[in-house]
Amino acid sequence: VPNYSEVLPKEASLETRLTKRIRLKIPLVSAAMDTVTEAETAISLAREGGIGIIHKNMSIEEQARQVMKVKKSETKIIENPVTIAPDATLREAKDVMARHNISGLPVVIGDRKLVGIVTDRDLRFETDLEKPVREVMTKEVVTGRALTTYDEAVAILRKHKIEKLPIVDENGRLVALLTFKDIQKEFNYPSAAKDERGRLLVGAAVGVGKGAIERASALVEASVDVLVVDTAHGNSKAVLDTVRAVKEKFKDCQVIAGNVATGDGAKALIEAGADGIKVGVGPGSICTTRVVTGVGVPQITALLDCCKVARQWDCPVCADGGIKYSGDIVKALACGAETVMVGNLLAGTDEAPGEVVFYQGRTYKVYRGMGSIQAMRAGSKDRYFQDEAASDKLVPEGVEGRVPYKGPLSKVVFQLMGGVRSGMGYLGARTIKELPEKARFVRITPAGLKESHVHDVQITEEPPNYNVP
């Protein structure tokens, strides 16, 4: 219901909490689904101010590599940069650059003593790739000292018109590297969600049971910011035991657990040590849990119940599922959630890992539930507590389908957050924290829902933030 307001949409702040310790610039989390979130989605969403949760339908090593890819995509100062020896060949240098997706390498000897730098420009016109790096590297290198501040380092880059500044200690040993590319990213993405070292935030999913701790250990080693104990039924012994075990072993790591749909479930997860809880049993567009099992709670009811309990422990809630329009995000936040997790809305973007398909002249991307037969066979059986079941004995709780292609993720996020800001303006809420205080819900009938949508007109041009239900 609209309120008296003195808040313009552009004045609304979207900053919020993901967990007790992690803050985001926007309340958007991408789902840990194998057709939604891998490194590319996580990088793009973190640059917009949200966070991506890398799915676990892959090996432990690959998931850790995906996390590292996000963490290394940008940083204020690169600590322990990748290096090469002067006797290495140009072929080896090119291979290292390609493997790490970088454009230059400091050249070091012995105990990381800096003797030069080689970049892709040095290699561009070289035809003899067996030539040693020492023959083409730049030997007179401009450097910064270990005590050089970030602003001083940026000034050195500008003064000497260089793109890379190695940072060395008093003995000339390489300790860090600053690049113009990372500085440029900071200007291009001022609202990016980053850790204290200037790296993008990223989360990763873990399951329950035997492999959970091993997977969590590898992810923590890869510098993951938050672990998500990701199951369909969070209020169960296996999940609660896993949360306790993860928190006990990795005390400094933030843990989100779910999914639950009742206050009792939320309380159990919080008491087990969760730093954030995920709410939603069956509201997702590709989820069939409520129909197959007969169990679930309508999402608004579940959120109101769980948020009431979570508020007593000051534990953030993430509303997972049921988000079709930006207005649904506003409703979830008005219930007391501090973030929303979306899958369908991002599955059609360029960055999503789903396969591109063409159907009847239109472009789509594959989108499947983690409870679909195909996803369960690929590794998500334990999410539905069927990890011991044979592939031909699985009981699915989701479907595989397709969603319209949507282009870059940034455009989708812009429209979603624009809708949220407008909703906050209607309610007179300057911050997300104020939304539950300002919001008042009314129950509508099917006739009211029909009236809410476009009616009595044929759409001739589709807007970027609305599609006919």
Language-model segments: what does each one mean?
Residues 56-70, 107, 111-126, 167-184, ...:
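Terminal amphipathic helices with adjacent charged low-complexity linkers/tails
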Residues 8-10, 59-68, 126, 130, ...:
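Active-site-adjacent beta->alpha loops and helix N-cap segments on the catalytic face
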Residues 54-57, 83, 104-106, 143-145, ...:
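Catalytic beta/alpha-barrel core
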Residues 1-5, 84-85, 144-145, 155, ...:
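Alpha/beta catalytic cores of nucleotide-metabolism and tRNA/nucleoside-modifying enzymes
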Residues 8, 12-24, 31-33, 62-100, ...:
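Bateman/CBS regulatory modules and CBS-like beta-alpha motifs in cytosolic regions of diverse proteins
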Residues 47-62, 224-236, 275-293, 323-357:
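Glycine-rich phosphate-binding active-site loops on the catalytic face of alpha/beta enzymes
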Residues 23-30, 77-81, 196-205, 246-261, ...:
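Short beta-strand/loop segments at the ligand-binding rim of alpha/beta enzyme cores
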Residues 40-42, 214-222, 261-279, 319, ...:
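Catalytic cores of alpha/beta
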